[in-house]
Design a protein with these regions (language model features):
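...captures the hydrophobic TM-helix bundle architecture rather than a specific catalytic motif
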Residues: 1-571, 575-623
Length: 623
């Protein structure tokens, strides 16, 4: 029975690959493929669920495919099935089927018709990988696919300014959550000394002994998991990204931010509940986060002027209550609540255009202005203050910008001297010297070895920060990113005798190929358009869709999406950072936090936004 679990991944994967066979004009075939794939998945899950119930609800766990294995670490795909998986899988299949049926007509004659359905199928693949995942590595694969499809769907109207800006804002916070999940996985490797599966979390004796032995490490792991879950589910104080993420088509907003993806933070807490529920501190923290979110989001939702923002904050408030329910151990109630909220928000978003049209028409015949009186009471002043604060969304967006991103931008601006030609040559030479030092590592004194690995890791971090703040030359920014990743790998290799050439090759091979493809695309743009600066959005996807596609693939390979060996390389790289190496961990984590934002920013600035050549109709900047 458990051997059937991988087929729930194969079905959407095959559907996504088949979508490339059609061009944008084949609307009937494209939508038919999507409906057929999701419909087949829904029927398969339903039949499997009946058989699973007849077998008296066995918990299924299967180790499917081993990516990498040596004496100390094993990286493998694992799939897991229980009642939580069943609820999320059925919910996802039903809602995705409804949305693709609706989108068949809603997206009719849209310029990106094929692109929309291909992205939806990729999203559905990532969603299924996440909910069927049996360990953190498998979950992280689905988590990454969801983050990338989020960026693509928000920026679906890629010739407009606001969708691109909001896509970058959303993916920035998503990346912060990804790094938190990565750090939880890193510490989990060091405390369990194996690739722990979710099935093993059900063994109370093993988990209790593990917590007693590694209490401080467990605090770190669960804190990272809570932050990752809070970001994915837009909980306080990370709530501001969700309404901004609804810049894409209404149908993608319904499935992504109204019903499925936004609830995966709840899924993560449920899946790891057996690991953290015995520590009361975490239950209290989750309850406080959920309660604060429910209160603040409710106040914000009641005063917003746009229907999508109202629905977004209403959903955030309900998910806050789900966090409380999960922390209290009321999982059945939380799952019922989750399904009700998902169906309601999907319905609200899908009918919102027609409802708004009716209300706009109706107000001409039945408009009654509200009468305001003069009130000077203390209660009215408090009410007005809360109203004003809620209109500003409690300054959550501004606070996130000031706390998370402005310090990194400021530091990057102070490092602009690293972008001179002389500096690039010096860093390239130092990198070659470091490679030579790695080759003759046995002859290097241990004291110098410890200094060099920290120095190289710090240089890698500074280079990627400089690229992140670059506003002048896209090619130089790309070169800085390439150098930063090479320094990152070398920093780990210099310290660890067991980090060999083969392990370096896993990460370097994917990055090197992506670097060459990206460099070629930027060079072709510069040759045709004379300059590739980052001071504005150029919208070159209108003229060079092929280059835009290949450059996007290069960006995805750079950030380690699972279609390249870089994904395995990142896992191996982090596994060789020891628990006591706090400085090295900090430099590496910041590097991986910023690199995705930096490469996607280059992609967005060069290829997305308003086309610089006004030889055809273009959208207003405010659209």
């Amino acid at each position: 029975m458990k051997e059937l679990l991988p087929y729930f991944i194969y079905i959407p994967l095959i559907g996504f690959l088949l979508s490339f066979l059609f061009n944008n004009k084949n609307e009937k075939q494209i939508s038919g493929l999507a409906i057929g794939v999701v419909g087949l998945q829904a029927i398969s899950i339903f039949v499997f669920a009946i058989y699973w119930v007849m077998q008296k609800f066995p918990v299924l766990d299967v180790k499917h495919f081993v990516f990498y294995k040596d004496v100390e670490i094993e990286i493998f795909l694992s799939f897991y099935f229980d009642a939580i998986t069943l609820v999320f899988a059925l919910l996802g299949a039903i809602l995705t089927l409804l949305v693709v049926l609706f989108s068949k007509y809603y997206m009719h004659r849209e310029e990106g018709y094929k692109r929309f359905f291909s992205t939806i199928l990729l999203f559905y693949l990532g969603y299924n990988i996440t909910v069927f995942s049996g360990n953190f590595e498998t979950l992280f694969i689905g988590w990454e696919f969801l983050g990338m499809t989020s960026f693509l769907l928000i920026a679906f109207y890629r010739d407009r300014y606001l969708p691109i800006k909001n896509a970058l804002k959303t993916v920035s916070l998503y990346r912060f959550g990804d790094v938190c999940l990565m750090l939880a996985l890193w510490m989990s490797h060091h405390t369990w000394h194996q690739n722990i599966t979710f099935m093993q979390f059900n063994n109370t004796d093993i988990v209790s002994a593990h917590i007693a032995e590694h209490y401080t490490d467990v605090l770190f792991i669960v804190t990272m998991l809570i932050v990752a879950a809070a970001i994915k589910s837009a909980q306080f104080p990370f709530s501001s990204w969700l309404p901004r993420a609804m810049e894409g088509p209404t149908t993608s907003s319904a499935i992504f931010y109204g019903s499925l993806s936004v609830h995966l933070g709840v899924f993560l807490l449920m899946r790891t509940y057996a690991y953290w529920h015995s520590i009361p501190l975490f239950s209290i923290i989750i309850i406080m986060v959920g309660a604060a979110t429910a209160i603040v989001a409710t106040l914000i939702a009641r005063v917003q002027s746009t229907v999508k923002t109202q629905i977004a904050y209403s959903s955030i408030a309900q998910i806050g209550l789900m966090f409380i329910e999960v922390a209290m151990g009321w999982h059945v109630f939380a799952l019922i609540h989750l399904c009700g909220n998902a169906f309601l928000r999907t319905y609200q978003l899908l009918v919102s255009p027609s409802v708004l049209g009716y209300l706009i028409h109706d107000q001409f015949f039945s408009y009654h202005p509200k009468q305001y009186g003069t009130q000077n009471s203390f209660a009215s002043k408090v009410t007005n203050s809360i109203y004003l604060l809620s209109i500003k969304e409690w300054n959550l967006n501004t606070t996130m910008k000031k706390v998370l991103w402005n310090p990194l931008k400021w530091l990057g601006k102070q490092l602009q001297f690293l972008q001179t030609n002389i500096a690039l040559i010096i860093f390239a030479v130092v990198l070659l010297m470091g490679a030579v030092a790695f080759y003759f590592e046995n002859n290097i004194p241990p004291q110098l070895d410890h200094v060099l690995h920290l120095l190289f890791s710090c240089i890698g971090m500074l280079l990627v920060l400089s690229a992140f703040a670059n506003r002048k030359n896209a090619i130089k920014a790309w070169l800085l990113i390439i150098l930063s990743q090479m320094y990152n790998v070398l920093a780990i290799a210099l310290l660890n005798d067991d980090y060999g050439f083969a392990e370096m090759l896993y990460y370097s091979a994917g990055v090197f190929l992506a670097a060459l493809i990206g460099l070629y695309c930027l060079w072709q743009i510069k040759k045709s358009e004379s300059h590739v600066s980052l001071d504005r959005f150029y919208g070159y996807v209108y003229e060079y869709p092929g280059l835009a596609f290949w450059f996007l693939l290069a960006c995805l390979a750079f950030i380690g999406l699972p279609f390249t060996p870089s994904f395995i390389g990142i896992d191996l790289l982090f596994s060789h950072i020891h628990k006591h190496e706090y400085a090295l961990l900090t430099f590496t984590a910041i590097n991986f936090l910023v690199v995705e934002i930096a490469v996607l920013r280059i992609y967005a600035r060069i290829f997305l936004g308003q086309h610089i050549k006004q030889t055809h109709p273009i959208a207003y900047k405010s659209s």
